[in-house]
């Protein structure tokens, strides 16, 4: 019976000491987390700059912009024409009552 009580007491003390050690363990500070975050972002930025310098990526970007320009130019011209027509309609409405 004494052996059982001593075993339970020993296990309880060991588990409490383990919990105490875990609580006393040093948590990473906010400053170190922020510093680590900025270091990671900086590393990604450097990697990205190296990838952008490649001629293949530059050629792909140029082709994409040229294709976009070809597709958007007619739409912009049509939107400009529609806007001019819309505004001229209101100008005509405004001048008609004055002439009558």
Curated annotation (Swiss-Prot):
One of its GO terms (cellular component) is spherical high-density lipoprotein particle. The modification Methionine sulfoxide is found at residue 49. One of its GO terms (molecular function) is cholesterol binding. It comes from the Eukaryota. GO terms for biological process: cellular response to lipoprotein particle stimulus; cholesterol efflux; cholesterol homeostasis; cholesterol metabolic process; diacylglycerol catabolic process; high-density lipoprotein particle assembly; high-density lipoprotein particle clearance; high-density lipoprotein particle remodeling. Its main location: secreted. Pfam families: ApoA-II. Monomer. Interacts with NAXE and NDRG1. May stabilize HDL (high density lipoprotein) structure by its association with lipids, and affect the HDL metabolism. Belongs to the apolipoprotein A2 family. This is Apolipoprotein A-II.
